[in-house]
């Protein structure tokens, strides 16, 4: 009989109220400019984090999940009888989290050469609910009695076909985090341009620029419809509740179905996109 557990990081943006039976979420540590440190999900709410972003001069720093924290979690799960552990990480191109997980696995087997546990480390190649949603479904699959291999295959196929469209109503954070150049941000702010960005397999690309706040949501929805062959299955995310509500009702009206989920975007996206940003996660055709 299998006893399968999943470890992921708080970049997954799985809602705090989601009741998952087989998933452990390790929070990123966030350090603000006043030197305070918080573990995401556990010490600080997203809303409080957005308030910090609103007033900060220097962007908070986020630390990856360390090898030691993974090692401790693996040991605890094995002690509790886990036969299979699947570790899902945020896109490894943007964080040392994946490498830390791989290292923790190696060290665990060096120290426990006779252990029969299976440990699989998966780079989601993604951000936010683009890996959080598949992890939520994998939790259900564990409850339904699927094998570890079925769950790993499912996760890999989901990660291969999720994308996120994102836009920000203020360019301050994209400029500070280097997502867009200072020159582009300056020109954009001068002309009232807002970037529409696609996050795909770890790559972030500006696919369109629109003029004025009113054009952001229609452009996001238009890009979404062009990029998916499954417009009924999507999730929206936001760092600003008012814009989130606007996006929700515009999507429902335009697509005929509400999103599967509406979530607050956590620190991994919010730090780079800012506290006035919105996004849509969806599936591509592959």
Model-identified regions with their sequence ranges:
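Mixed-charge interfacial surface used for oligomerization/domain docking
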Residues: 2-5, 11-19, 23-33, 94-97, ...
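N-terminal glycine-rich anion-binding loop in soluble enzyme alpha/beta folds
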Residues: 4-64, 69
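Aromatic side chains
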Residues: 38, 49-50, 70, 98, ...
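Intrinsically disordered, low-complexity regions enriched in small/polar residues
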Residues: 40, 44, 51, 72, ...
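Short alpha-helical interface patches
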Residues: 46-54, 72-74, 157, 214, ...
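Hydrophobic residues in alpha-helical segments
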Residues: 53-54, 78, 142, 175
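Glycine-rich phosphate- or other oxyanion-binding loops that anchor nucleotides, phosphorylated ligands
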Residues: 55-106, 148, 152
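Short acidic, glycine/Ser/Thr-rich loop/turn "cap" segments at secondary-structure junctions
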Residues: 86-89, 119-123
